[in-house]
Structures are given as C-alpha cells and as structure tokens.
A protein has these predicted regions:
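Acyl-group handling in specialized metabolite and lipid biosynthesis
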Residues: 87-100
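A generic structural signal for alpha->beta connector loops
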Residues: 17, 92, 125-127
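Amphipathic alpha-helical surface "interface" segments used
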Residues: 80-90, 129-130
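An anion-binding loop in the catalytic cleft
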Residues: 98-183
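Donor/substrate-binding cores of folate-linked one-carbon enzymes
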Residues: 1-85
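A short catalytic or substrate-binding loop motif that flags glycine-/basic-rich loops and adjacent residues
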Residues: 12, 88-90, 112-113, 152
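Short glycine/serine/threonine-biased micro-segments
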Residues: 10, 28, 69, 92, ...
Length: 183
C-alpha cells in the first residue's frame, strides 16, 4: 500500500514488516520471497522506523541473493485480501485536530516528522508545522475544552489540551500563542 511506514505509525500499530515479493498485475499481491516482522516501539518515529526497516531489508536482500544463486528461492502465495492496502495520504491527513486523543496526536506527529512534511495545526490563519510532541497523561484538565493553550514551557514549548489528556509541543515552527487561547 501507499506510505506504509507513515500509516503504521499514525495508526499506532505495534509492528510492521519488510516484505519482498514478485510484482504482478495487482497492488502488492505477488508471491512473497521474504518477509520479516519488526516491532514498533512507542519512541519510534518516521526516521527511526525507516532505519529499522532498512537494516532488516539489507539482511533480507543478502539472503534472497544467496537463495537465488543456489536456486533455492521459495515463493509463498499471498492470501487474497490478506494484506493491508492503505489509501494515498493527503494534506488534510496531517492536520492536528485537538479533539483527537493525545495518543492519536502523538502518533500523527511521529509519523509525519522529518524527513516527511510534518503534522500541522492552524493558528491565526497560519499553518504551524509540528515535528515532535510529548504526551502528558493527566486528569487535571478533564473539564477543559480541547485546543486550549494551558501553559508555556521554555522558549517554544506549549501545553495544549487534547481530547483526553495534554500534548506538549516539543519541536515546532516558531509561533507566539497566549495562555488561554483556543486553537
């Protein structure tokens, strides 16, 4: 499918896979020649997951080449409808909706961080790119509406009420917001 690493992170999956397969007439349906599952940790982002997959893929390629050389490459048919085929992502898919859960926002940001386009929110008609956030699990602000700027931490850090908890902006484009404002 399209954007498999981004989708795996954005959906909060606990694992993904590196798969080599023969091309055929349909999307991602050819016979599999190598597949390795990889765990996705809470700390993983687009960059770290990409490196994990690439490291495994290098090992897989060596094994595939050795098996080809020995004429021992095994092909495994894929189950019809057994894999995930995700749709193409658009710009709106990267927009932070503060009504989302803190985990969903965290997952969205880590999925779209550099080298990708970044998650974003709109403040005073300006798109603000967000590269890293921290999830703060607390019941202290349960009765505050999502999107409220709760506090300023350091030079650029803001704590913002999410649907269920709090999100701290750790790394984002420069923006000046006031405590009490709503996004």
């Amino acid at each position: 499918g399209r954007h498999p690493l981004i989708w795996a992170l954005a959906l909060g999956l606990e694992s993904t896979a590196s798969t080599f397969f023969y091309m055929d007439a349909h999307a991602d349906t050819g016979e599999i020649v190598s597949q390795r599952e990889l765990p996705i940790s809470y700390e993983d982002d687009a960059t770290s997951l990409y490196h994990k997959v690439m490291n495994v893929a290098v090992d897989q390629l060596e094994e595939i080449m050795n098996d080809l050389e020995k004429n021992m490459l095994q092909k495994i048919p894929q189950e019809i409808g057994g894999g995930n085929v995700w749709r193409k992502r658009g710009k709106r898919d990267g927009e932070i909706d503060w009504r989302m859960s803190s985990r969903a926002i965290y997952n969205l940001v880590r999925a779209l961080t550099k080298p990708y386009v970044g998650a974003h929110f709109v403040y005073q008609d300006q798109e603000i790119k967000v590269w890293k956030v921290r999830e703060i699990i607390t019941k202290e602000y349960d009765y505050i509406e999502p999107g409220k700027v709760l506090s300023v931490t350091g030079q650029m850090g803001y704590r913002i009420k999410a649907g269920d908890n709090v999100i701290e902006l750790v790394q984002c484009e420069p923006v000046h917001m006031e405590i009490g404002e709503y996004l």
